[in-house]
Design a protein with these regions (language model features):
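His/Asp/Glu-rich acidic catalytic environments and adjacent acidic regulatory segments
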Residues: 1-95, 99, 103-106, 151-172
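Active-site-adjacent bridging/hinge elements
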Residues: 75, 79-80, 84, 127-129, ...
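Extended non-transmembrane interhelical loops and adjacent amphipathic helices
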Residues: 22-27, 149, 182-187, 191
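Short pre-active-site segment immediately N-terminal to the catalytic Zn-binding motif
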Residues: 140-148, 152, 159, 196-213
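Extended, well-ordered alpha-helical scaffold/bundle regions in very large, multi-domain proteins
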Residues: 107-113
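Catalytic zinc-binding patch centered on the HExxH motif and its immediate surroundings
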Residues: 142-143, 177-197
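A glycine-rich phosphate-binding loop feature that marks nucleotide/adenosyl-phosphate handling sites
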Residues: 14-20, 72, 118-136, 170-181
C-alpha cells in the first residue's frame, strides 16, 4: 500500500481559495481541508477519495493479503489471535486494548457534542468529514519559513544544554533533514537511522505555525 499510495497515485487539480488551479498532493491536502471556503474543502475531499476509489480492488486485495499474513504468523507463533500477536510486540495485554475501546465508546457523547458545537459555530446545516479540520477561529495568517523555524527551535531548546543544541544545529545544517515535498516522496514525517550513521529526518514542510510546532 505504501508504494501505491506514495509513488503511483496522482491526485487531480482543483481551484483553491483564490481560483488558482492547484494539484492536490499528500502534503497540501490538509491545507485544502483547513480552507475557510467550504466548496474548496468539499472538492478536495471528493477528488482525493474518488482517486482512491479507482484503486479499490487493488487496496482490497492488499488488505486481504495483510489479514491472511497476520493470521498466519499468529497461528504459527501460537497466539490466540492476530490481535494478541500485534499487541505482544509492545507487551500490551488485550485487556488494556478492550478497556481503551470501552472508554472511548463511553465518552462518545462528548465528541458528538463537540461536532454539534462545530456545526453551530460554522453555521452549517449538516457536518461532513471535510468540515472537521477548518479552524473555528480566524487563522492569524502567520507564515513561518523553514529557516525561521530553525531559529525558533534552536532558541526554544537551548535550555537542554550546549551539547544538545550543538548536535541539533549540526543536523539542521548538514543535510540530515529532507525538508520539502517531492513527487514520489513518502508522505508524513519520520526519523530513522542505522548503526554507524547519523539519523535522518523525512518531512514535507509548509510555511505555517502547525509545521513549526
Amino acid at each position: 500500500f505504501s508504494v501505491l499510495n506514495n509513488a503511483d497515485i496522482t491526485f487531480p487539480s482543483i481551484k483553491d481559495e483564490n481560483g488558482k488551479e492547484t494539484q492536490i498532493t499528500h502534503g497540501n491536502f490538509i491545507n485544502f481541508l483547513e480552507s475557510s471556503n467550504r466548496e474548496v474543502r468539499k472538492n478536495a475531499f471528493e477528488a482525493v477519495y474518488k482517486t482512491y476509489g479507482q484503486y479499490k480492488n487493488t487496496m482490497a486485495t492488499t488488505l486481504s493479503g495483510t489479514v491472511k499474513k497476520d493470521n498466519f504468523y499468529a497461528r504459527v507463533k501460537k497466539y490466540k489471535s492476530a490481535r494478541e500477536a500485534a499487541l505482544s510486540n509492545n507487551s500490551i495485554p488485550e485487556e488494556v486494548y478492550d478497556n481503551l475501546i470501552k472508554t472511548i465508546n463511553k465518552h462518545l457523547p462528548l465528541l458528538h457534542r463537540y461536532i454539534d458545537l462545530r456545526k453551530k459555530v460554522l453555521g452549517l446545516d449538516e457536518v461532513h468529514i471535510y468540515d472537521l479540520y477548518t479552524p473555528l477561529v480566524k487563522d492569524s495568517g502567520m507564515k513561518v519559513t523553514y529557516e525561521e523555524a530553525k531559529d525558533y527551535m534552536l532558541k526554544g531548546l537551548a535550555p537542554l544544554g550546549e551539547e544538545y543544541a550543538s548536535i541539533l544545529k549540526e543536523g539542521l545544517e548538514n543535510r540530515w533533514v529532507d525538508i520539502y515535498e517531492n513527487k514520489g516522496k513518502r508522505s508524513g514525517a519520520y526519523s530513522s537511522g542505522t548503526y554507524g550513521t547519523n539519523p535522518y529526518i523525512l518531512m514535507n514542510w509548509h510555511d505555517n505555525v502547525n509545521n513549526l510546532f
